[in-house]
């Protein structure tokens, strides 16, 4: 199954999405801000990114723009 990176500063949302995806058989990787998401993407294979738009440090839009410079993976913005 696919590796899915879930990124949101709200840990409850990350956990809820993660539980659902894991029940469906996906491997879930968790990040809690845009900087952490970029670091994860540089260090391990990810097939899909689900990212929140409003986060501290680096918001979802700016993180997505930086990620797109290096990685063409599919992204779902919440």
Regions found by a protein language model. Name each.
Residues 1-5:
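Non-catalytic signal-transmission and effector/linker regions of two-component phosphorelay proteins
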Residues 8, 52:
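Active-site residues of response regulator receiver
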Residues 11-29, 43:
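Two-component/phosphorelay signaling modules centered on CheY-like receiver
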Residues 32-36, 59-62:
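Acidic catalytic/metal-coordinating carboxylates
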Residues 39, 61-73:
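Short amphipathic alpha-helix used as the core "switch/output" element in two-component signaling
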Residues 44-50:
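Active-site beta3 strand of CheY-like receiver
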Residues 55:
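Receiver (REC) domain active-site loop signature in two-component systems and cognate sites
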């Amino acid at each position: 199954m696919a590796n899915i990176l879930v990124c949101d500063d709200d840990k409850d949302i990350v956990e809820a999405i993660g539980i659902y995806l894991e029940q469906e058989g996906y491997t879930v990787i968790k990040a809690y801000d845009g900087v952490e998401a970029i670091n994860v993407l540089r260090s391990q294979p990810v097939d899909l990114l689900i990212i929140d738009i409003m986060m501290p440090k680096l918001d979802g839009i700016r993180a997505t723009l930086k990620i797109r410079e290096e990685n063409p993976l599919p992204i779902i913005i919440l």
